[in-house]
């Protein structure tokens, strides 16, 4: 399990700087000399060097670094991260604020250097990390992050972790390469024309056609997006990440809010019986067409109300789903309304497998799904490689 440790406390006063060479330090010497003076991971050093040295060949003097330390390294650690990540001219963190830091991470982290010959994958990895950060932290869809939002989302704890952990796949929050690979491959499977956009017919194929046509319509109409100004009938890669993280981890508070907004067609903040029956009618029709026994809507509604105990007679509000006792059932309730395959799996679940799932190593459904799917993708790729090798051998013979 990946546990983000709390940010360490910094001393309230700066110790005297160690002896500084008489000449300005160019980046290689600067990074060696200053890596222990700056309380951030080494992949922040290129950004700091660029702030202090007007050009790559000017170098940094002792006076410049001393002034920088006295003005930038006296804050709390989360403030240091925030201020050194954002642009000096901006009061907030935008998606582009993270790009220089993540570009540096790609060249510094031992678990990512293999991507150096795959520029396209490097950029998609950066896109993925940024989208995951904003998915977790920018719940209001503002398009930027404040100090408070970063602190609440424990962004810098994840940066600390990726700075000290050599196995990138152990950093499950934001940075795991395996998680990126799963997200990107799932998008790639649906984006058949390779225009980096998903349409409604594309999304209907997700999860072996598990989603109803009505929920797909609503996802495009009301689903939270990374790009608020995107085309309404198209979903970019980052928008797809928002969808997929919500779909495969319905127990998370972020996903609950995502699906509640999608289901709440009139936007009044209440899911009433009419709202839910509209979705269930589509679901029950699909079950009938496939020969499955259909549970009456009234029985589903009664079960739902017994589990979440809504506080209002008018219907269910998002706070009802967010109660601690609803963490384990919210996903099943959503699936009953619009995901046929998962709903049928839930209805026929094996108690032994459910107990095994509760006792496994994963903290949430997304981590579990990503691990299993990555292993599946890796096995498929290995099989394709074996088939190619066999064909080459046969051709040589």
Where are these regions (language model features)?
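Conserved long hydrophobic alpha-helices within structured protein cores
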Residues: 92-107, 272-278
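Conserved beta-strand elements of beta-rich interaction domains across eukaryotes
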Residues: 30-32, 67, 98-100, 150-152, ...
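Intrinsically disordered, low-complexity regions enriched in proline, serine, glycine
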Residues: 43, 77-78, 94, 110-114, ...
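Extended repeat-based solenoid scaffolds, especially LRR ectodomains
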Residues: 145-150, 154-219, 225, 234-236
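Short, flexible helix-coil linker/hinge segments at the edges of structured domains or between repeats
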Residues: 98-123, 147-171
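Primarily EF-hand calcium-binding motifs
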Residues: 5-69, 75-95, 100, 116-142, ...
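Long, highly charged low-complexity segments
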Residues: 1-18, 181, 207-210, 215, ...
């Amino acid at each position: 399990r990946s546990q983000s440790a709390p940010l360490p406390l910094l001393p309230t006063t700066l110790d005297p700087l160690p002896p500084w060479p008489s000449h300005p330090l160019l980046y290689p010497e600067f990074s060696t000399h200053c890596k222990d003076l700056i309380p951030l991971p080494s992949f922040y050093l290129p950004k700091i060097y660029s702030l202090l040295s007007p050009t790559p060949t000017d170098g940094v003097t002792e006076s410049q670094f001393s002034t920088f330390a006295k003005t930038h390294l006296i804050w709390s650690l989360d403030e240091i991260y925030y201020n050194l990540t954002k642009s000096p001219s901006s009061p907030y963190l935008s998606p582009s604020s993270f790009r220089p830091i993540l570009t540096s991470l790609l060249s510094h982290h031992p678990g990512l250097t293999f991507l150096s010959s795959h520029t396209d994958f490097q950029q998609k990895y950066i896109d993925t990390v940024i989208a995951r950060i904003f998915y977790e932290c920018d719940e209001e869809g503002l398009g930027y992050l404040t100090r408070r939002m970063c602190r609440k989302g424990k962004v810098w704890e994840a940066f600390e972790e990726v700075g000290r952990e050599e196995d990138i796949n152990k950093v499950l929050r934001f940075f795991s390469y395996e998680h990126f690979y799963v997200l990107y491959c799932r998008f790639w499977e649906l984006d058949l024309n390779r225009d980096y956009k998903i349409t409604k017919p594309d999304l209907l194929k997700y999860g072996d056609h598990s989603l109803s046509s009505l929920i797909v319509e609503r996802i495009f109409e009301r689903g939270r997006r990374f790009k608020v100004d995107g085309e309404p009938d198209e979903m970019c890669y980052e928008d797809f990440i928002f969808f997929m993280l919500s779909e495969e981890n319905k127990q998370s508070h972020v996903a609950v809010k995502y699906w509640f907004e999608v289901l709440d067609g009139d936007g009044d903040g209440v899911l009433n019986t009419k709202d839910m029956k509209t979705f269930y009618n589509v679901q029950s029709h699909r079950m009938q067409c496939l020969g499955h026994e259909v549970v009456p809507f009234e029985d589903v509604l009664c079960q739902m109300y017994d589990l979440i105990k809504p506080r209002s007679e008018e219907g269910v509000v998002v706070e009802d789903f967010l109660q601690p006792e609803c963490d384990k059932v919210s996903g099943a309730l959503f699936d009953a309304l619009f995901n046929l395959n998962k709903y049928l799996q839930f209805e026929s679940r094996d108690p032994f497998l459910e107990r095994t799932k509760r006792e496994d190593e994963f903290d949430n459904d997304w981590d579990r799904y990503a691990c299993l799917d990555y292993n599946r993708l890796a096995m498929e790729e290995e099989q394709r490689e074996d088939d190619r090798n066999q064909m080459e051998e046969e051709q040589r013979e």
